[in-house]
Design a protein with these regions (language model features):
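Well-ordered, non-membrane alpha-helical segments in soluble/globular domains
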Residues: 1-6, 43-50, 77-78, 107
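An N-terminally biased module of ancient metal coordination in phosphate/nucleic-acid-related enzymes
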Residues: 1-19, 24-26, 48, 186-189
């Protein structure tokens, strides 16, 4: 599986790598991103089974933050999972849709203490205006980390390296836009 590599005409030395992946919803109603996985995974497995399947397929599992999705019972399940997980090959995901006023989620602090890296990403909502947000919140890696025959393999190896340095970029969502988008989401669901 190779990534799609994009170059900007105005900055040809800068590359953007897009890799295969998809979202799965567990039995506990927790979202898991399966990065570097093209093969579909079934929804409805337990969190443990889902993460194990992603790893078996050579992927990287990411538990993405979402508004209200890490509170209550689901938050407790994720917390327990973070505390008891096998080290390596698990990430949490932040997203640019988190509003400016929202404090850093407690599970991100726990992740740091347990050696789990937080990967930022834009995660735009399904509205035309959100298309402009794609790639506006994310991370970069050290300059030479993606050189080699396979950018996908290099990216995956860099992310799994115990010495990985994630350099986040972008801003959290403006409060007014956050509330507007949440209102719009509830109207369409």
């Amino acid at each position: 599986m190779e990534s799609l590599t994009l170059f900007r005409n105005d900055f040809p030395e800068e590359e953007i790598h897009v890799v295969a992946g998809h979202q799965v919803v567990t039995m506990e109603n927790i979202e898991v991103l399966a990065l570097f996985v093209r093969q579909g995974l079934p929804n409805g497995l337990s969190l443990h089974e889902t993460v194990d399947r992603v790893k078996e397929l050579g992927g990287i599992p990411v538990l993405p933050w979402g508004v209200g999705k890490w509170f209550g019972k689901r938050g407790k399940i994720i917390k327990e999972f973070l505390v008891n997980h096998e080290k390596g090959n698990l990430f949490l995901g932040d997203n640019g849709g988190r509003p400016c006023f929202w404090p850093t989620p407690n599970l991100f602090n726990l992740a740091e203490k347990t050696g789990v890296v937080v990967l930022p990403g834009s995660d735009p909502l399904p509205f035309p205006s959100e298309a402009l947000r794609v790639g506006s919140f994310g991370f970069s890696l050290q300059e030479n980390s993606l050189h080699g025959d396979s950018p996908t393999k290099c990216l995956k190896n860099a992310l799994l390296s115990p010495n990985v340095t994630i350099s986040p970029f972008g801003c959290l969502q403006e409060n007014r836009l956050f509330f507007l988008n949440q209102f719009r989401l509830r109207r369409i669901s």
